Amino acid sequence: MLDLIQTRRALHQIPEIGLEEFKTQAYLLDVIEKLTTGKDFVQIRTWRTGILVYLQGSQPERTIGWRTDIDGLPIVEQTGLPFASQHQGRMHACGHDFHMTIALGCLERALEEQPKNNLLFLFQPAEENEAGGMLMYEDGAFGDWLPNQFYGLHVRPDLKVGQIATNTHTLFAGTCEVKIRFKGKGGHAAFPHEANDALVAASYFVTQVQSVVSRNVNPIEGAVVTFGVFQAGTTNNVITDTAFLHGTIRALTQDMSLLVQKRVKTVAEGVAAAFDMEVEVELKQGGYLPVENNPALARELMDFFDEKDGIELIDIEPAMTGEDFGYLLSKVDGVMFWLGIDSPYALHHPQMSPKEEVLAIGVAAVSSFLKKKAAE
């Protein structure tokens, strides 16, 4: 039987960033091959650093998918754990070591007997940086294994062990990276009339773009436009010719995301025109679409967990954080949910360390749900 804690600790020590998960893939394949030995209803495919494990059903009517992400983050770990990261500047600070371990535990249970319906276990790379789910889908990695329904989870530090939270609508926002560069004309601070100050134009943009959320977004829906980087100039007495802004757009529906993206671009171009200068606007959403749960499937999952002993189900509000599972859920109906891990430190914090007792709880809960779906 798979030692969940040992497995998690082994994975925790080898975090790798997206599309570089070579050791992680090798470790996972070793475990998967041991678990599936002698199971003639199992097939395994790899795609770059990703893995697909397909359990052929005995009387299949559909394919049920379970997705887990496998990449780490470019963070220096500060947990002080004896099994801390062995990769300098890399850490499983988003709980993907837990996600992988739970998926392996569920795979082990699913292999106890051939399911009626097909089951697909997806070990997906590059959730954090390259939208690996989109890359796999667009490259045809699923082939005829593409699920009819897709499920997945994400650990959440501010929920207690035993708590599962989701809803029947949007769980994660869609995110879009924004880069804007204003191009004016440099000059000496003493002669502003001979220059065209990009810093001033960019400053006007930062204040004016706030009107997008306050005046273009339905307040019931909500959206976020935040610029965390503003770079302009090198010294106090020189007017800069360029100003660079780097920010993010967050929205709970794709339609709203596209509206906000359009308005941000329009405001930037309007400011540039008013100051008689050029502007470059780069909007990069890629595969980070809103994670929109299928209402009927979400209600089914919530009802199932609500009746499970040891599980406290929470109907939770959406989060403005992003998750690339949204892309796959835009192609296949499915559900994502939060799993409580009770950590005082947030996701992506260098001291984030979940409680390991959640591993057994997660495996028991998810495997029982997948068993139900596979038998329908």
Swiss-Prot record:
Tell me the protein's name.
N-acetyldiaminopimelate deacetylase
E.C. numbers: 3.5.1.47
Q: Name one GO molecular function term.
A: N-acetyldiaminopimelate deacetylase activity
Q: Does the keyword Amino-acid biosynthesis apply?
A: yes
Q: Which domain of life is it from?
A: Bacteria
Give the family this protein belongs to, as stated in its UniProt record: Belongs to the peptidase M20A family. N-acetyldiaminopimelate deacetylase subfamily.
What the entry lists under SUPFAM superfamilies is as follows: Bacterial exopeptidase dimerisation domain, Zn-dependent exopeptidases
Query: Is Protease among the key words of this record?
Result: no
Job of this protein: Catalyzes the conversion of N-acetyl-diaminopimelate to diaminopimelate and acetate.
Q: What class of enzyme is it?
A: hydrolase
Pathway linked to the protein: Amino-acid biosynthesis; L-lysine biosynthesis via DAP pathway; LL-2,6-diaminopimelate from (S)-tetrahydrodipicolinate (acetylase route): step 3/3
- Keywords, alphabetical: Amino-acid biosynthesis, Diaminopimelate biosynthesis, Hydrolase, Lysine biosynthesis
